[in-house]
From Swiss-Prot:
Pathway: Sesquiterpene biosynthesis; trichothecene biosynthesis. Disulfide bonds: none annotated. TS is a member of the terpene cyclase group of enzymes. It catalyzes the isomerization and cyclization of farnesyl pyro-phosphate to form trichodiene, the first cyclic intermediate in the biosynthetic pathway for trichothecenes. It serves to branch trichothecene biosynthesis from the isoprenoid pathway. It comes from the Eukaryota. It catalyses: (2E,6E)-farnesyl diphosphate = trichodiene + diphosphate. One of its GO terms (molecular function) is trichodiene synthase activity. Its EC number is 4.2.3.6. This is Trichodiene synthase. One of its GO terms (biological process) is sesquiterpenoid biosynthetic process.
Length: 377
């Protein structure tokens, strides 16, 4: 295993943050905690329901961690949408993270997908059954064009996760494969379209801006995620199918060359994002900028990405990139480092346990009632 290229990672991260003029001022601390708890509380009650518990079959600790991660992502990044929209998106994207972490083969459950869809029957695949049930709660916030993007991108994401089950990095020489898979499982169009709720944006009058934002966001958000998650995935056996490592296989290049390819694409996309929308509708630009800054804050502060380890490792170094990275990290931590104990309560497992007891109590109360009716008959 190669050593992690710390200096290169620092330089790339610093350039990214400078290109987007990183300065997250999306919330006061009180507003951030309020929105985090609101979105978490609604989502936690959703996943504590008996049907969700029965069909998902996810380890409680993993579900809790997934929910906390996604609530953070949505609240930090979708800073301009309503709290209700944040909560509904948090539920939707938690479902996607649960699927992404799953290792179940979907083949058998997808045999009759289209026939069931056409006939209006519940999907055989439990994930689709639950996602479809929740989808109306998400789509009610958006116009028809954005809604279509959310539906289509979610379908693509499912297919991308299916492909990833095979741990296939592409055949050597198949240069289109890495980006094909990354676009499919990146949820870029879903994310890009979900920034524009109909109560704030008229998708007809802003159709060109919204379409362009979806196109730009598709690559920007997945490439930034790939870059910021490179450290956590570097030596994790479960994360060996990544864009960078697929470049190594398909393009037959070194890890350093693959990382450089991702770096140049990410920086170019960041420049485009700022340049394209700087003279467009001000509300559109503010929304995009808030998303970009919040999305970076989330990556820097969420423990899933372990970037605090990088900061600790280089904080005594005197190089310009190390000092700049630590300054950016401190800047992000000052606004985004909020302990889950301040907002992620009560735990989903506790809520599920209460619901389970309530169901049992109802059944116990109902049983003698039925017996009495039978006796009368």
């Amino acid at each position: 295993m190669e050593n992690f290229p710390t200096e290169y990672f620092l330089n790339t991260s610093v350039r990214l943050l400078e290109y987007i003029r990183y300065r997250d001022s999306n919330y006061t601390r009180e507003e951030r905690i309020e929105n985090l708890h609101y979105a978490y509380n609604k989502a936690a009650h959703h996943f504590a329901q008996p049907r969700q518990q029965q069909l998902l079959k996810v380890d409680p600790k993993r579900l809790q961690a997934s929910l906390q991660t996604i609530v953070g992502m949505v609240v930090y990044s979708w800073a301009k949408v309503s709290k209700e929209c944040m909560a509904d998106l948090s539920i939707h994207y938690t479902y996607t993270l649960v699927l992404d972490d799953s290792s179940d083969d979907p083949y058998a459950a997808m045999m009759n997908y289209f026939n069931d869809l056409q006939a209006g029957r519940e999907q055989a695949h439990p994930w689709w059954a639950l996602v479809n049930e929740h989808f109306p709660n998400v789509l009610r916030h958006f116009g028809p064009f954005c809604s279509l993007n959310l539906i289509r991108s979610t379908l693509d994401f499912f297919e991308g996760c299916w492909i990833e089950q095979y741990n296939f990095g592409g055949f050597p020489g198949s240069h289109d494969y890495p980006q094909f898979l990354r676009r499919m499982n990146g949820l870029g169009h879903c994310v890009g379209a979900s920034l524009w709720p109909k109560e704030q944006f008229d998708e007809r009058s802003l159709f060109l801006e919204i379409t362009s934002a979806i196109a730009q966001m598709e690559n920007w958000m997945v490439w930034v995620n790939d870059l910021m998650s490179f450290y956590k995935e570097f030596d994790d056996e479960r994360d060996q199918i990544s864009l960078v490592k697929n470049y190594v296989v398909s393009d037959e290049i070194s890890l350093h060359e693959a990382l450089e390819k991702l770096t140049q694409d990410t920086l170019h996309s960041s420049k485009q994002m700022v340049a394209v929308f700087s003279d467009k509708d001000p509300q559109v630009m503010v929304t995009i900028e808030c998303f970009m800054h919040g999305y970076v804050t989330w990556h820097l502060c969420d423990h899933r990405y372990r970037l605090n380890e990088i900061s600790e490792k280089v904080k005594e170094q005197k190089t310009e990139d190390a000092q700049k990275f630590c300054k950016f990290y401190e800047q992000a931590a000052n606004v985004g480092a909020v302990s889950p104990s301040e907002w992620a309560y009560p735990p989903v497992a506790q809520l599920a346990n209460v619901r389970s007891k309530d169901v049992k109590n109802v059944k116990q109360i109902e049983k003698p009632l039925l017996s009495s009716i039978e006796l009368v008959e």
